[in-house]
Amino acid sequence: MPSYTLYYFNGRGRAEICRMLFAVASVQYQDKRIELAEWTQFKTKMPCHMLPILEIDTETQVPQSMAISRYLAREFGFYGKNNMDMFKVDCLCDSLFELFNDYMAVYNEKDAAKKTELQKRFQNTCLRVLPYMEKTLEANKGGAGWFIGDQILLCDMMTHAALENPIQENANLLKEYPKLAALRTRVAAHPKIAAYIKKRNNTAF
């Protein structure tokens, strides 16, 4: 088993899905959290000058959160059993990441007028993405389990990670999508994920 170090800011953000994968796989890693005040000195040392970064065996450093999460999901067995499964996982994760990115744009915007426009975009993205996800989940055993097959996969965990802050801000976000809401509850109740959530750093994002 290689050694892993995950570099990110002291928050959940784009790295939380990676941390959840380490937790559910029971794989040890170094969780290196960089404070914003330290970022300037670290920035030029990081590939693409961005976070998160996954370092493998102190030799290979790779950026891009979704590339990292997909790599870890493949390595740990949470990416499906065949190419069609993986295709579906990618589709669901990309849809959630689009929603997550739109929410982050709202979260980070300081200008009130721009924030209002970005909020409309986020709401439109929700109206496109969430019905599709609800229908996709329901197609697998009525939506009572996971998105694909009988095992929790990357896309299930992504449903929890990507929607955490949006739901904290709007508790009714999934009111019209009861299957998705129940899925998030199942993910959070997974013994290894529940243990991780209980002990993780308490951060705003």
From Swiss-Prot:
> What residue stretches are annotated with the GST N-terminal domain?
2-80
Show the Pfam families listed in the entry.
Answer: GST_C_3 (PF14497), GST_N (PF02798)
Residues forming the GST C-terminal domain are 82-205
Known tissue expression: Lens.
What keyword terms does UniProt attach to this protein?
A: Eye lens protein
Q: Which GO terms describe its biological process?
A: glutathione metabolic process
InterPro entries reported for this sequence: Glutathione-S-Trfase_C-like, Glutathione-S-Trfase_C_sf, Glutathione_S-Trfase_N, GST_C, GST_superfamily, S-crystallin, Thioredoxin-like_sf
Q: Which GO terms describe its molecular function?
A: glutathione transferase activity; structural constituent of eye lens
Write down the superkingdom of origin.
Answer: Eukaryota
Function as written in the Swiss-Prot or TrEMBL entry: S-crystallins are structural components of squids and octopi eye lens. Contains relatively little if any GST activity.
Q: Which family does it belong to?
A: Belongs to the GST superfamily.
What protein name does the entry list? S-crystallin SL11
The species this protein belongs to is Nototodarus sloanii
